[in-house]
Curated annotation (Swiss-Prot):
Name the UniProt record assigns to this protein: Ribosomal protein uS4-like
A Pfam entry, by short name: Ribosomal_S4
Lineage: Bacteria, Pseudomonadati, Pseudomonadota, Betaproteobacteria, Rhodocyclales
Other noteworthy facts: A C-terminally tuncated form of ribosomal protein uS4, this is probably not functional.
InterPro entries: Ribosomal_uS4_N
Source species, domain of life: Bacteria
GO molecular function: rRNA binding
SUPFAM superfamilies (UniProt xref): Alpha-L RNA-binding motif (SSF55174)
Family: Belongs to the universal ribosomal protein uS4 family.
Length: 115
């Protein structure tokens, strides 16, 4: 199973959100985008595609799933009755590794997969 093993704080800074299980550090100290010129980047207006991509990446990194796993969850949610967005979150919350994290047995999302 492949998973992201790179710097977690850089992901949080790129997304602009403090993801709860991604790490123990918060974005309070360095809240600018990552990179050499991150502090000087002007907040340009994102396109609709850019906003949707950002939200998808937040979901992926928050729940620790790959692109293929997320696609499978979305297809399952489309088949079920009800609001698709709510079903996606419901299916992701039902995963065993997420239940281990929510129950408090693992402090971070990386450790929840090992439990």
């Amino acid at each position: 199973m492949s998973r992201y093993t790179g710097p977690r704080l850089k992901i949080m800074r790129a997304l602009g959100v403090d993801l709860p299980g991604l790490g123990r550090k918060s974005m309070q100290e360095r809240n600018q985008p990552p990179g050499q010129h991150g502090a000087r980047k002007v907040a340009a207006r994102k396109s609709e595609f850019g906003l949707q991509l950002m939200e998808k990446q937040k979901l992926r990194y928050n729940y620790g799933v790959t692109e293929r796993q997320l696609r499978r969850v979305v297809l399952d949610a489309k088949r079920q009755k009800g609001v698709t967005g709510g079903k996606i979150v419901e299916l992701l919350e039902r995963r065993l590794d997420n239940l281990v994290f929510r129950a408090g047995f693992a402090p971070t999302t990386r450790l929840r997969a090992n439990s």
